[in-house]
Curated annotation (Swiss-Prot):
GO biological process, one term: amino acid biosynthetic process
Keyword annotations of the record: Amino-acid biosynthesis, Aromatic amino acid biosynthesis, NADP, Oxidoreductase
Gene: aroE
Listed PANTHER family: BIFUNCTIONAL 3-DEHYDROQUINATE DEHYDRATASE_SHIKIMATE DEHYDROGENASE, CHLOROPLASTIC (PTHR21089:SF1), SHIKIMATE DEHYDROGENASE (PTHR21089)
NCBIfam families reported in the protein's UniProt record: aroE (TIGR00507), PRK00258.1-2 (NF001310)
Catalytic residues in the record: 65
Family listed: Belongs to the shikimate dehydrogenase family.
Taxonomy, superkingdom: Bacteria
Binding positions (shikimate): 14-16, 61, 86, 102, 217
Classification of source organism: Bacteria, Pseudomonadati, Pseudomonadota, Betaproteobacteria, Nitrosomonadales
GO terms for MF: NADP binding; shikimate 3-dehydrogenase (NADP+) activity
Source organism per UniProt: Nitrosomonas eutropha (strain DSM 101675 / C91 / Nm57)
Name used for this protein in its record: Shikimate dehydrogenase (NADP(+))
Subunit field text: Homodimer.
Length: 277
């Protein structure tokens, strides 16, 4: 049976095995999908061992997306643009194809599942790590009026601005730099919610915002979404839909078929609430 896994640290919280099990049943594929904990200093070693034991492909999550980019021997165009990789497909001659499905997963969830049109909108993206860099190009391809990147370390946000400056109207800086501006959509791409923490976003930035989105998923509102709700935002969405949509893109890369996602999103929400009760 073909073996796949999601690799990260921490990893026990991951719902990727649940999602890919649903996809396999839906499409009639025989596959084993599990979690793989890698030491913070042992990503490449863990990947090599997994492959030597017959692994076919991997999903990569926090904090290894930049290391995965460096380890891949071939890259898809979207992974090359992102400088970050969240999917490996192992190929012949020890080749590793690296892809990044985060951006298309996010955009599909926002534009299709949530029916939120991005053209002309002002978007604030919080964070400048692997999760953020993976979604910038797909967001810009939707032609927003502005994509602003805010980060605790502004130099990293400015570096991303310079990396993607030819793809659309993009700017970068510290959170405080955007006080007084109004955004239609605010996206949290930091890992703060993973640690039950709140990014340093000024309350002022939520004024007039139509949709607030946390790329991490939870059985209840994340601290970021809870904070947004106290500022009067009512359209609050976590990353459950994005997780399923990006997983479907990985499944497509591995198996040549894109599974249906709507039912799986509903099943995953039920699963999250079941384990929270």
């Amino acid at each position: 049976m073909d073996t796949y896994a999601v690799i990260g640290n921490p990893i026990t919280h991951s719902k990727s095995p649940f999602i890919h099990t649903q996809f396999a049943q839906q499409t009639g594929r025989s596959m084993c999908y599990t979690t793989l904990l890698a030491p913070l200093d042992g990503f490449e070693r863990t990947v090599t061992t997994f492959r030597e034991n017959g692994g076919i492909g991997l999903n990569i999550t926090v904090p290894f997306k930049f290391e995965a980019y460096a380890l891949a021997t071939r890259l898809t165009d979207r992974a090359r643009a992102a400088h970050a990789v969240n999917t490996f497909r192992f190929e012949q001659e020890n080749e590793i194809l690296g892809d990044n499905t985060d951006g298309v997963g996010l955009v599909r969830d926002i534009t299709i599942n949530l029916d939120f049109a991005l053209p002309g909108k002002h978007v604030l993206l919080m964070g400048a790590g692997g999760a953020a860099s993976g979604v910038i190009l797909p967001l810009l391809q939707q032609k927003p009026g502005l994509l602003a990147i805010a980060n605790r370390t502004p130099d990293k946000a400015i570096a991303l601005q310079q990396q993607f400056v030819n793809h659309g109207n993009i700017t970068g800086g510290h959170y405080q730099d955007f006080i007084g501006q109004q955004f239609d959509l605010i996206i949290n791409a930091t890992s703060a919610s993973l640690h039950n923490a709140l990014p340093p976003i000024p309350a002022d930035l939520f004024h007039g915002t139509a949709l607030v989105y946390d790329m991490l998923y939870s059985s209840k509102l994340t601290p970021f979404l809870e904070f947004a709700s106290t500022q009067g935002v009512t359209n609050l969405v976590d990353g459950t839909g994005m997780l399923v949509e990006q997983a479907a893109e990985s499944f497509l890369l591995w198996h040549g078929i894109r599974p249906e996602t709507q039912n799986v999103i509903r099943q995953l929400r039920d699963e999250l609430h079941l384990h929270a009760s």
